[in-house]
């Protein structure tokens, strides 16, 4: 017999009302639960004080909040903080908090590891260990010490969001719904390499900003960097995007890590200009952060600026993204929980030996 409790964090308003109904409570109790969860961020059912003690006891007999504090934190000299959060499956994901003047962005993970296996990404080297339920995605925000300072959320951590689309859509629904965090979808950006069928569904069902990982405009070269090119090519991705309006509130951006001698030539810049012609978009150029045993190198600042200036002068709005958290391996492409989990388990084993 399974005596494990179910979780409230990650349930929609309709589902919370159904929980109340199933336990013999008035439907409005579901609305009360939503307020306690998504407005007050309570840690226990007993904190839901406008629900009767008897009903709280009924609820607690079958459910728990489902939140979990971070297991580890690393602090960068530039103010960036990398958190390690446990998941309900007993695994871990990394989440990066990036403060910057009047903004504070949280980079959340949607999977443990990743299937995409991009050549330049440490997460892909970890392998794929599972997709996060919406509750685990939301817990990275819910249990963040700086949650009240957040201005933006980006789904650019571990995993491919489109490969876990049901849970990403559920999480963004709760973040943007009136009963949830009530955030504008314009405060949320979801990234993707481009996953066949899934990207179209996301564009139809969500109003959040979109960031496409391009990294090379030439399909044969992109396939060498990103195996996902063989599933849905960058040309197919761009053709799909041309069916949607990005000229108003919703923003489309392309991510482009610049590699020395690989994708940094004028040929590549011209191919980008031709490829995105007619699209209202922006380009973010990203510095490559060295990964062990990967035969790729970054370019110097002068080369980055030349590439940016050429694109900008030909009508493609382009910026160079500031690298944050390099000293704690929190920058783009560096997230991986493998080593840190080993350290934590070793520490737990040592602690257990001391207690025996």
PLM features: residue spans?
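Generic beta-strand structural signal
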Residues: 81, 93, 104-108, 116, ...
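Conserved AdoMet/S-adenosylmethionine-binding subsite of the radical SAM
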Residues: 145-152, 157-321
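Canonical Radical SAM [4Fe-4S] cluster-binding loop centered on the CxxxCxxC motif
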Residues: 99-136
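Ferredoxin-type iron-sulfur electron-transfer modules in oxidoreductases and energy-metabolism complexes
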Residues: 135, 139-147
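P-loop NTP-binding catalytic core
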Residues: 89-98, 102-103
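Short linear Ser/Thr-Pro motifs
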Residues: 76, 109-110, 191, 213
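Auxiliary Fe-S-binding modules of radical SAM enzymes
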Residues: 1-93, 242-250, 258-356
């Amino acid at each position: 017999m399974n005596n494990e409790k179910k979780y409230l964090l990650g349930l929609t308003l309709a589902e919370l009302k159904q929980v109340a109904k199933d336990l013999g409570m008035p439907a409005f109790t579901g609305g009360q639960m939503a307020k306690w969860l998504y407005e007050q961020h309570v840690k226990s059912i007993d904190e839901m004080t406008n629900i009767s003690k008897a009903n709280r006891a009924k609820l607690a007999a079958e459910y728990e909040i489902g939140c979990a504090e971070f297991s580890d934190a690393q602090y960068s000299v530039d103010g960036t903080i990398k958190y390690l959060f446990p998941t309900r499956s007993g695994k871990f994901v990394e989440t990066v908090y990036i403060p910057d003047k009047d903004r504070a962005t949280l980079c959340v993970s949607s999977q443990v590891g990743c299937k995409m296996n991009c050549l330049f990404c440490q997460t892909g080297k970890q392998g794929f260990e599972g997709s996060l339920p919406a509750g685990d995605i939301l817990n990275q925000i819910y249990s963040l010490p700086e949650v009240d300072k957040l201005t933006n959320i980006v789904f650019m951590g571990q995993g491919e969001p489109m490969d876990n689309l049901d849970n990403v859509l559920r999480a963004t629904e709760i973040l943007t719904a009136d009963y949830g965090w009530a955030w504008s979808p314009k405060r949320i950006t979801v990234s993707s390499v481009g996953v066949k069928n899934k990207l179209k569904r996301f564009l139809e069902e969500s109003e959040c900003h979109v960031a496409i990982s391009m990294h090379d405009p030439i399909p044969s070269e992109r396939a060498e960097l990103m195996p996902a090119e063989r599933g849905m090519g960058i040309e197919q991705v761009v053709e799909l995007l041309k069916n949607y309006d990005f000229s108003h509130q919703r923003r489309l951006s392309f991510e482009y890590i610049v590699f020395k001698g690989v994708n940094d030539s004028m040929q590549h810049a011209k191919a980008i200009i031709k490829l995105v012609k007619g699209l209202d978009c922006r380009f973010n150029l990203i510095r490559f952060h060295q990964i062990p045993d990967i035969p790729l190198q970054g370019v110097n600042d002068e080369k980055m600026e030349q590439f940016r200036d050429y694109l900008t002068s030909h009508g493609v709005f382009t910026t160079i993204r500031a690298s944050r958290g390099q000293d704690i391996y929190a920058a783009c492409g560096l997230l991986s929980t493998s080593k840190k989990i080993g350290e934590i388990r070793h520490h737990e084993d040592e602690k257990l030996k001391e207690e025996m």
